[in-house]
Structure formats: C-alpha cells, structure tokens
Amino acid sequence: VPVVMAGVLGIYGLIIAVIISTGINPKAKPYYLFDGYAHLSSGLACGLAGLAAGMAIGIVGDAGVRANAQQPKLFVGMILILIFAEALALYGLIVGIILSSRAGQSRAD
C-alpha cells in the first residue's frame, strides 16, 4: 500500500508539468517574467510538497509494515496516517494549479 501511495506523488508532478508546458507557447504570445516566476513557483510548490509527502509516506510505511507484521490491528491506523501524508502532496498540487493559472493574468500591454 505505501508503494502505491508513493507512486501517486509522481503523477501529481506529471500533472503540474503538463499544465506548465501547455502555458508556454512563445510563438503565440510573449512570455513575460511574471509567467516564468508563476510557473517556477507552481513547480516548486508541487515538488516540495511531494518531497515532504514522500518522506512521510516512506517513514510511516516502513514503520507500519513492520508493526503490521507483529500486530495486524494497526493496519487501519497505518492507512489513515498514509492518507494524511498523501494529503500534503494533494495540497501542493492544488497550490501549484492555482499559481500556474495566475501566469497569464499580469500583463503590461
């Protein structure tokens, strides 16, 4: 279970990468400095949140699998803690989407 939850974090990064790459089209419109910083901040927000969530999932998953072998009643508690750790990355994805959507809004035309 922890391996699957850790794999989802990579998908969150892929989603942000696709959103950022669709916002970059220098032939259709100029790419302003604000757009670059918005895309950079959205990638960093999702990436750092994914890093923190991955570390939490790794630590909790390791301890949970070891404890589950000794006492199977701890499985539900382990899953709940893993879900809360996954929520960290989901919040980072949401913030990244919000920041990336701001990329085309500040124009000095």
Curated annotation (Swiss-Prot):
It comes from Zea mays. The chain crosses the membrane at residues 1-20, 40-61, 74-99. It is a multi-pass membrane protein. SUPFAM superfamilies: F1F0 ATP synthase subunit C. Gene3D superfamilies: lithium bound rotor ring of v- atpase. Its main location: membrane. The record marks E86 as: Essential for proton translocation. Keywords: Hydrogen ion transport, Ion transport, Membrane, Transmembrane, Transmembrane helix, Transport, Vacuole. This is V-type proton ATPase 16 kDa proteolipid subunit. It is found in: Vacuole membrane. Proton-conducting pore forming subunit of the membrane integral V0 complex of vacuolar ATPase. V-ATPase is responsible for acidifying a variety of intracellular compartments in eukaryotic cells. Signal peptide: none annotated. V-ATPase is a heteromultimeric enzyme composed of a peripheral catalytic V1 complex (main components: subunits A, B, C, D, E, and F) attached to an integral membrane V0 proton pore complex (main component: the proteolipid protein; which is present as a hexamer that forms the proton-conducting pore). One of its GO terms (molecular function) is proton-transporting ATPase activity, rotational mechanism. GO terms for cellular component: proton-transporting V-type ATPase, V0 domain; vacuolar membrane. Residues 62-73 are cytoplasmic. High expression in the mesocotyl tip of etiolated seedlings compared to the base. Coiled coil: none annotated. Belongs to the V-ATPase proteolipid subunit family. Residues 21-39, 100-109 are lumenal.
